[in-house]
Amino acid sequence: MTSPRARRGEIWLADLDPVRGNEQAGIRPVLVISATRVGVGPGGLAIVVPLTGTARTNDGAVAIPAGEGGLRRDSYALPVKLRSIARERLLARWGMARQETVDAVADRVRALVGIEPPRR
């Protein structure tokens, strides 16, 4: 079976189980933030930020409205839960997030790891 090829900015349904500790669990949408070339080749990975439908305001979550990228309800990207996953965990492509959303999530990730955001 061929693993799906995820592209930066796509929203996918993914199986994040099994998890440890406070990692985001379950089958849920994720936003791919890795450069598309990262997932190329056998054994490729995708760097993703899990999404939740629970309103979050105190941990750097980024709001994404229903309809964007195929989301069925208002959602929140959780940059603090960033992780690399095997492409085999990707179950179904839902759509593409707006560039502004991808940029906002990427900026939060940069802040988490201490990298200055690019000047726009």
Where are these regions (language model features)?
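Conserved functional hotspots at enzyme active or ligand-binding sites that engage polyanionic ligands
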Residues: 1-120
